[in-house]
Amino acid sequence: MPKHLAKLHENGDIYYHDLDSYNLTVNCLNIDTGRILQRGFNTGYGTINAPKRIESAAELSCILLQSTQNDMFGGQAHVNFDNDMALFIPNTRSEIRKEILENLKGLEVQEEVLNKEKIDELVEERLRLRIHQAMQGIVYNLNTMHSRAGSQVPFSSINIGIPKDKDAALICEIFLKEYEKGLGKGEQPIFPNIIFRVKEGVNREEKDPYYYLFKLAAKIAGKRMNPTFMNMDSDFNKEYYDKGIIPATMGCRTYVCSNISGEEGPAGRGNIAPTTINLPRVGILAKKDINKFFNLLDNRLELARESLLHRYNVLKKLRVKDLPFVVGEGLMKGSENLLPDDSIEPILKQGSWAIGFIGIAETLTAL
């Protein structure tokens, strides 16, 4: 790193996050969970086939988070968890129905016992039980399974609340209820961060079809301080929602939707690297001169940009084989046609490079 950039970090003017990973990997990722699960994946020891049942899909969704975190220094999110898990409900339902009919076959039962409505009712009852078990497994796994050489559990986030059908709504409801229960003795689950998305016409108002999910989420937030809520009707979210893109975020609030290098949307994208400007110091140095403050801030912003470009040029020297899961398995947008010895530069153009700040209240006090 150039000395003038290194000095900024050493002096506390600009903070470069996760220096120990500076030349090794990138920050975080929104996983296109449904797509990856439906095609299967390889964590390095062999191929994992696409799951057929909700229990398998739930378990493998945790493995996706864990394996992704082993390749990165930040967090991971399922961008559309309830809809993605719902993909595996029809097969599970069919399997349950087949089991029930096989058990009834050959038994002497009254005709009304075989009534289609009663069988449907029994199928849905057993389906709910299996979904409960699958969602409980997710809560348990994400608070116990370790990644990064055992140093922590995956920093996981799950986006829910905009179900495309009744199966997705069922996943959303049961997942929230299992999270509310907590761990084995009712302990607070630290993970996953849950982001419940609120949208007019979907779940915001009492007249909306999935309002009951919003009410359930609000009730659980009052008890568990989780989920947090994302307003799909805000201008910057509605712009994408109206295009058919459902915005998503992470517990750390990484938000990636716009894209100057390709297709918009969060899936397969995330933050590559962040920097943070020490804003109170800028306010103090300005000595209550607002023009001087903005001149100093412009200087800090330019230096932060320069530091990110330096990091970009360092990271583009990495090869696909250096990040074998997130890039080698095509989880990150831009990695689709790359070979093991190719540069990872295409994925660096698909994520955000963040310049943030700290201490706005203290800055205003100084000014």
Where are these regions (language model features)?
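Conserved catalytic cores of very large enzyme subunits
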Residues: M1-Q350
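Contiguous, well-ordered alpha-helical segments that form the cores/surfaces of helical PPI scaffolds
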Residues: W353-A366
